[in-house]
């Protein structure tokens, strides 16, 4: 959005010597890291941005690539799984200004310590994620029946910055729509949800507004605010919604198989790819 706005302004009032293409590496970084659908113009911008990122002139990004041990030719997976998480970890661990400082540092600042700080945040995030995931698995075994159509878990010992990642892992492991909720000292839970095909989290949220303080997102990923005392009511309402609106057959996990051909091998090299334009497999 910012890139398109800048493009429109420069068309109206050109600035001599200013080339917006110099920022395509940051456009690619932001687009992939934020899981923006890689379709139409987004795909084109990311494709050219990845090429420019290999010779980036942005000191902070270059240092971050060094710390992440990312080398060309770059793919969307390099950004999505190695560079992006280190930037996002700063916000997840309550230090978003560190990511901004690293990306905006000029030639007079040594960017390596800033990049290493982001790498440290990412290691902290990974440790916290592992701890919460292990705890969530234990809670699931204690609180849920295997036939339950949904997973809704909450704790005062969980960090709100990583509940979305844990929700994704739980959803993939059990193939059930999942909300993981971090509860603060006032008893207000901030939850992150991830869903399976056929189950819209927004429809489920709208059907259970009476149990929630707030909720928003889209069909496959959403966030909620819920009082600790209402989590059980929300879990029951969420389960009822899924049972009543989505058949058990539609909730089955499906494996799509295809033939391996020369054309498919060429297709496997297609870049970039992400959630909206799946990586060929």
Model region roles, listed by residue range:
Residues 239-245, 249, 275, 279:
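Secreted, periplasmic, or luminal enzymes acting at the cell surface/secretory milieu
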Residues 11-231, 240-244, 256, 260-263:
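Hydrophobic helix-and-loop "lid/oligomerization" segment in the mid-to-C-terminal part
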Residues 252-254, 259-281:
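Accessory interdomain/linker segments of ATP-dependent helicases and helicase-like nucleic-acid enzymes
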Residues 1-4:
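Short, glycine-/small-residue-rich phosphate/pyrophosphate-handling segment
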